[in-house]
């Protein structure tokens, strides 16, 4: 039997004929003007940027209280602090450059993005939107590294404990500002624009995702997660994870060498396996410690800690596996009980007037026992 074949033009024509017979809307709808559509698109994009900026400022205001009140828990990881942050249009994707500059005045020169209430910058009169022209006679560069260079300069000058002389452009005028630095835990707090419920610490930074900011219902919840990640950094968990990974890798390397001596080429498989296993050692304990120390950071900043366990319970409902998974995080029931115990411990210390410091295995250092890595939540 001869196979039936269809030419492409004939098939396309048949498809169009079938589609033409499909049901259509029954009302006469308004036509959409292309110019109006472009304007609406721009408005919505402006709203996206504004929402990000508001989340950023909220995050920085909460974080400022925590890093300035928790200096005793940061041991040797403290630095000068002014209570200001900066951004330039390079901190936004290229597709947003036009909007952030034309609508919000953020150019390729660093400008002040937030000023923490009560901070040195706030008391000196620094305002969000100020464009930084000079720092003790030094002119900040423009472009990709504008913000990093500015923040590095502020830290460098602050280490001398001398007044910081700023010249900023505010509107059409130049304003001179003088201020002295305070002290804070020396970790930068950043907001990732990604729309996921996540946060992590990397030993130098605390990164909160925009999706997590949208998930927070109260500033106490913001403080809880920031404090948890700060605890990872303060307890040097990232360094500990790296050390454990190195030890595991060395053990694996010895196995690779032994296998090679027996005529087996493992291609370094044991070293990689050992490194991964080493990095995972104490991961659950490190998370528990970050919960524990983090609540002390939070309480020292004056935030209410009563609902801490309830927040992690709500987080668990978005990831049901977390209720039983214990590979790198404590299970939710276990976490809830441990957090409630810590909350009661802190309540008792507050009631008796004791210092709000974690109970350490070794009382030698301010807060430095075992140490771990940034683990997303």
Feature names for model-found ranges:
Residues 149-190:
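PDZ-domain C-terminal substructure recognizer with occasional recognition of PDZ-binding tails
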Residues 291, 304-306, 310-377:
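Extracytoplasmic and endomembrane cell-envelope/extracellular-matrix remodeling and assembly machinery
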């Amino acid at each position: 039997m001869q196979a039936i074949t269809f030419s492409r033009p004939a098939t396309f024509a048949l498809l169009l004929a079938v589609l033409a017979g499909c049901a259509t809307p029954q009302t006469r709808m308004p036509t959409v003007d292309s110019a109006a559509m472009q304007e609406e698109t721009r408005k919505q994009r402006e709203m996206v940027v504004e929402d990000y900026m508001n989340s950023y400022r909220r995050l920085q205001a909460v974080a400022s209280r925590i890093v300035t009140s928790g200096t005793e828990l940061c041991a040797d990881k403290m630095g000068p602090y002014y209570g200001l942050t900066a951004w330039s249009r390079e901190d936004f994707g290229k597709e947003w450059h036009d909007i952030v500059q034309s609508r919000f005045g953020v150019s390729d020169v660093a400008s002040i993005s937030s000023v923490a209430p009560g901070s040195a910058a706030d008391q000196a009169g620094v305002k969000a939107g100020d464009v930084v022209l000079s720092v003790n006679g030094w002119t900040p560069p423009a472009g990709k590294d504008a913000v990093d260079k500015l923040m590095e300069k502020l830290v460098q000058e602050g280490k001398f404990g001398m007044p910081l002389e700023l010249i900023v452009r505010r509107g059409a005028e130049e304003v001179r500002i003088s201020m002295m630095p305070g002290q804070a835990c020396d970790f930068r707090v950043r907001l990732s624009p990604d729309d996921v419920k996540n946060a992590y610490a990397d030993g130098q930074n605390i990164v909160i995702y925009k999706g997590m900011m949208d998930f927070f219902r109260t500033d106490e919840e913001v403080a809880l997660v920031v404090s948890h990640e700060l605890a990872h950094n303060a307890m040097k968990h990232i360094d500990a994870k790296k050390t454990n990974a190195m030890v595991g890798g060395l053990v694996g390397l010895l196995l690779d060498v032994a296998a090679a001596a027996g005529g087996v080429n493992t291609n370094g498989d044991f070293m990689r396996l050992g490194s991964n296993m080493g990095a995972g050692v104490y991961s659950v304990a490190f998370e528990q410690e970050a919960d524990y120390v983090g609540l002390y950071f939070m309480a020292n900043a004056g935030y209410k800690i009563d609902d801490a366990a309830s927040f992690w319970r709500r987080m668990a409902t978005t990831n049901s596996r977390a209720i039983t998974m214990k590979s790198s995080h404590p299970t939710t029931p276990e976490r809830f009980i441990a957090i409630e115990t810590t909350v009661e411990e802190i309540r008792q210390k507050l009631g008796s007037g004791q210092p709000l410091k974690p109970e350490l295995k070794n009382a030698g250092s301010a807060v430095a026992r075992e140490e771990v890595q940034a683990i997303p939540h």
